[in-house]
A protein has these predicted regions:
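Bacterial N-terminal signal peptides that target proteins for export
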Residues: 1-8
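Hydrophobic helical h-region of N-terminal Sec-dependent signal peptides
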Residues: 9-14
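Structured domain cores in non-transmembrane regions
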Residues: 42-166
């Protein structure tokens, strides 16, 4: 075997070994999300001293990295999350990823709702709590969000509140927010996906303020337009107009098909 061929074999072998070593010692995992249209997440990653470390790091030297901070204009669904890092000589490990779920519902800057989800990371976890990965190295946790609507102000502008709950493997809603937990040793090189669905129907934020009718809901008048709560109290005949995001005046939400003059 000539020298050139031996050199090629040696270089190829070293590259293969280095590649495998790098794969086995990955110091990050991929966080991604499958979200409804007009949804985006912001991720903040928090680190704590590794188990056995006696050191502490001032907050100013251990700031939480953020992904998708400019979620309206520069949103990217994939984020590479560092698992271990060193600050001031102290070995740190990821403790949790706090997730803001933002969703736009209207044309104005303030026409958006926000909810929260979380990925927790521990050195050890009970098997019943620890999320698992499939053969492709992917793990998914799911949730469902629903819009809750109400009116604010004397003109009764529609505003919405985003309510998100975790769903189990069968799609049933749970009481907690979307959440998943992993151990440090199972994360390197893996992918964690947050999958969120949007409920087909919206519902009133407060009970006894709207009446269900064909095409949607009618807003109870209460004591008048200045009555911010305007509970129905059994009066299902006197209703008010309200203003949709964007200013349209309507009598039925969300199936508004006509403009109405405001009557006081």
């Amino acid at each position: 075997m000539n020298l050139t061929l031996q050199s090629l074999i040696l270089v190829s072998s070293l590259a293969l070994v280095q590649g495998c070593a790098a794969l086995g010692t990955s110091n990050s995992f991929t966080l991604t999300a499958d979200l409804p249209p007009d949804f985006a997440y912001v991720a903040s990653v928090y680190y704590v001293p590794a188990k056995g470390q006696a050191c502490t790091v001032p907050r100013a030297d251990n700031l939480a990295p953020q992904f998708n901070r400019e979620w309206r204009t520069e949103y990217k669904p994939d984020a590479q999350i560092e698992i271990r890092r060193t600050r001031k000589g102290c070995e740190l490990v990821v403790d949790r990823v706090e997730l803001e779920i933002n969703a736009i519902y209207g044309p104005d800057w303030s026409d958006f709702g926000r909810e929260y989800a979380q990925v927790s990371v521990r050195a050890e976890l009970p098997e019943a709590v620890k999320a698992t990965f499939d053969a492709a190295g992917e793990s998914e946790f799911s949730g469902q969000c629903q819009w809750l609507f109400r009116t604010i102000g004397p003109n009764r502008y529609i505003t919405k509140i985003l309510d998100c709950k975790k769903t189990d493997a069968s799609g049933e809603l749970l009481k907690s927010r979307p959440f998943a937990a992993y151990t440090l040793d199972e994360l390197p090189g893996k992918t964690v996906k947050m999958k969120i669905k949007l409920a087909n129907e919206e519902r009133p934020y407060m009970k006894d303020t709207w009446v269900k009718v064909p095409g949607g809901w009618k807003r109870c008048m209460g004591k008048g337009f200045e009555d911010q709560y305007a509970f129905c109290y059994g009066n299902h005949k006197d209703f008010s107009t309200f203003r949709m995001p964007g200013g349209r005046i309507c009598t039925i939400y969300p199936g508004c098909t006509e403009d109405k003059e405001v009557t006081r």
